């Protein structure tokens, strides 16, 4: 009996900067462990497929191609797991790069949420590489050969659960996206977060 609770987890994979194949392998191992523990929702860190500290490597098409290939491996691995997984990945849309959270399960991508607020102070200078969520005017994106919903206001609903996603700095602003998500029915907010140390 679960008494209406949902079993959730956060997972921090061992990560190597710009080694998408290695990182996706670590993520898949954690997905399999989550499946053994009957986790229903598992949240991974921001940019966990590439590593957060890639710097100007984010401008390299090879890294971005490898990131999407690694994401495809992870999506395929979810065919054997029951958990909804949320992973961080840099993704392109029409020559613009976004820091995104990808919501996946059952071998499919349910939606992709771009980061709304990019930090640009101290050691953080994401605006050098990424566009903010409001810089997209399309409601979908082609990723891993799938056309999927894309935007900062996505809600993922199943039964009585309505889930929303935000990334790191989004939580730090005066009125975070989670406030609006909650007003629109979200009862679970998943936050992907990473800070270099």
What are these regions (language model features)?
Residues 1-195:
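Enzyme catalytic cores with a strong preference for nitrogen-chemistry domains
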